[in-house]
Amino acid sequence: MNLRQLSEHVFQCEFELDVPLRIPVHTWFIKDGDDVYIVDTGIERFADAQIRAALAIGNPKAILLTHGHSDHIGGASKWLERFDIPIFAHQKELKYINGEEPYPNKNEVENTGVAHIVQPLTEQTLAHLPLKYYLTPGHSPGHVVYYHKIDRTLLTGDLFITSKEDLHPPIRRFSVDINENIDSGSIIDQIKPTLICSSHGEEILYNEELYKNYVVRYRD
């Protein structure tokens, strides 16, 4: 695991999956005073290292999910074994996290280990923080991104796969509607963050050509 500070209040954990290529998996910590908010948990075997890293920064306060796929939620049950903290995702994601229905692009329901524990995100969930969530459907129906308003840092989950200079869509077969996902990417032109951070890829600085080039290259 590699822990890096991306901005004053945002830290990034990087792990690697071998499936069979090496794929980086990023999760994040948002520091607020002595408290730490965890954005995504990675898979279960990442949890112990992630917990140690979080405790070095502050006191775990809550888990915020971008969506319910296993490489984002798989470690959540381990966190809840250690800490009595709430876990949140968008309302539209809960029936998949709870195993009530499979994702529209899958045949089997998810086994998240936190069924009927995850609470719906509301405006009040983050009202005390300089953090805002935005619904960005396509990769999954209830996918969200999180924007730290002070640090101007956008945590995009699987909305994009990023390289140093370009945006790319998530893997099509793991996405419900790739064109809807690409349309959701317009959020970056609405927010205009300084830094864009994805779950799988490199940090990239925002510029006004990024999304235009992305649409031209990938939108059907």
From Swiss-Prot:
Its EC number is 3.-.-.-. Pfam families: Lactamase_B. Keywords: Hydrolase, Metal-binding, Zinc. GO terms for molecular function: hydrolase activity; metal ion binding. InterPro entries: Metallo-B-lactamas (IPR001279), NDM-1-like (IPR050855), RibonucZ/Hydroxyglut_hydro (IPR036866). Its cofactor is Zn(2+). The keyword Metal-binding applies. SUPFAM superfamilies: Metallo-hydrolase/oxidoreductase. Binds 2 Zn(2+) ions per subunit. The keyword Metal-binding applies. Zn(2+) 1 binds at H67, H69, H139, D158. It is an enzyme of class 3 (hydrolase). Zn(2+) 2 binds at D71, H72, D158, H200. Belongs to the metallo-beta-lactamase superfamily. This is Probable metallo-hydrolase YybB. It comes from Bacillus subtilis (strain 168). The lineage of its organism: Bacteria, Bacillati, Bacillota, Bacilli, Bacillales.
